[in-house]
């Protein structure tokens, strides 16, 4: 007889009241054991014995109850899970309060770390069994009833699934993928819940922007109250408030990435809400402001700011991965898996997503660094021959323009950490490293980002200050080497107190614990010593002892040479002989040129010929040929030296029509009457203007008659006209504008 599923199974048991056998459903509240599950509380941050003891006692109760629950048979387990509310509250409290791997928590004692790992494993196995509808061929639940049990009893919901992914995703990815996939497969209503949850996730981004003063309430039409303060920007808000925002962003981005990495089928639901564009817009507005705010506070608390910078870098990386997972799931993977006839829709979706992001310059740069856009477009070109080259070229050009003015340094992609492998019937659980130093964010951050954060927060300690820190540690722990102390100081941001405390409590980081404690300090050579970087006229010559090891000492002589005297030095013509070949090549020095009889050397200079006055046409000249006489310019007397001939006419400079003037009178060297000269000049000017057709205005009316005798009507009109038209005489229109102002009533009359 085949076994029945648990939801249809009937069991017979004795009625405690009547003692008679009674048949009831296997999933019955009466089958629930009377057991109270205590709530989980997070471990203490400080090593206070009372707090540690309280935590260990409570955690021990929770661990024992979960171990008892996991040991129950199939029907008893599901009765306890469905009908015991204290169990659900206990599991919810663990998901709510357990420290994440990016939280600021360090296990105060090894006992606390062991207990935390035990609880971590037990909670994961409990949820894993709750998500399995078939444990064996005899113990199973029908799929339809299983989905109803999960959904109607709130055993799983979207927030729980998100917490499960972020808490247990590392090292347990295959189990989580099977677990969450089974939940969504057996109960499709969870897709509807996820669709209703995504607006809340988008509201988280809006809340961060509003809290940073980067986005106002667009739905509000009422004006802001006078007494109401506008939100502070990240650069102005207190440091602890900025820290809370960074932690909130880190939690949100890590949770989203963990969920989509485990369950990528949810990407279609996310993209229904235009999630890619909303994510890129949030990234463009929030990330640069938060980075700038942290860099501006480099002098406040270097340790806290370094931790915040690492968390912000981690958030950036996870947001990039979220975008990449969605793009890869809804566009690229279907293109690779589909035939050529069905990929046009996916290609159009890819181009549409990037076309909406072209104005987000910072996001495009960071995503192009994380995953080059050109490679994705190259994949599209290989998959389809009908790809719109204009749109792809436009997208690539926009990505290149986003890099303008920025040093393009590619960062190596970080490989995913290895995941635990397990068979179908073998449960493999890797506990989270809750006891490790969270501020380092191990296995989360790339080395380049950490180094960039350290560089941005200020220069490293060096010189006398570094020697002082080393001596502080060495005075208390003299057996340690200076090299080991220096490595500890560099790891803990040059905090000598933290170094001493961690050494005494044996809580050093793993990379420091492996070092030799007697390691001596190594002197770092100067990268650019002066001797190797100098440059002068003796650089690399035969006597430069800094660039060569051996020098010919026979060429070096100190003092006066005794073998030679001044006469022998003067008679030494070796230098002249050495230059002879050079001058001979260029034919500069020629002593004698042999000539054959009858030859004439035209270049020779003849003393009998004197050409001193040839240029001035003075003296006896040789007879010239007819062609030379024709082509030569005739000699003329300069105009300044000429004497005016009686019949010659003179043209005035201002006569543009070349009209012939009357013959000028003979120059008179005596001084004439100035009044006569002025009259002649005025006559010449009037004659010139008359030829031009210029008619001067009659200004006699403006001049007027003598004072006290009155003015004529023409004089009064001309003066009024002159007063009104002063602007035409470069008076800048002051009178007209003054009248205009007065007519408008701006100036009292």
From Swiss-Prot:
Ligase recorded as keyword: no
Main subcellular location of this protein, as a coarse class: nucleus
DNA damage is among the record's keywords: yes
Residues that bear Phosphothreonine: 233
Composition skew (Basic and acidic residues), residue ranges: 663-675, 711-726
One cellular component term from this protein's GO annotations in UniProt: DNA repair complex
Keywords assigned by UniProt, alphabetized: DNA damage, DNA repair, Nucleus, Phosphoprotein, Transcription, Transcription regulation
Recorded family membership: Belongs to the ASCC2 family.
Domain notes: The CUE domain specifically binds RPS20/uS10 ubiquitinated via 'Lys-63'-linked ubiquitin chains by ZNF598.
Function statement: Ubiquitin-binding protein involved in DNA repair and rescue of stalled ribosomes. Plays a role in DNA damage repair as component of the ASCC complex. Recruits ASCC3 and ALKBH3 to sites of DNA damage by binding to polyubiquitinated proteins that have 'Lys-63'-linked polyubiquitin chains. Part of the ASC-1 complex that enhances NF-kappa-B, SRF and AP1 transactivation. Involved in activation of the ribosome quality control (RQC) pathway, a pathway that degrades nascent peptide chains during problematic translation.
Name used for this protein in its record: Activating signal cointegrator 1 complex subunit 2
Native source organism of the sequence: Mus musculus (Mouse)
Gene name of this polypeptide: Ascc2
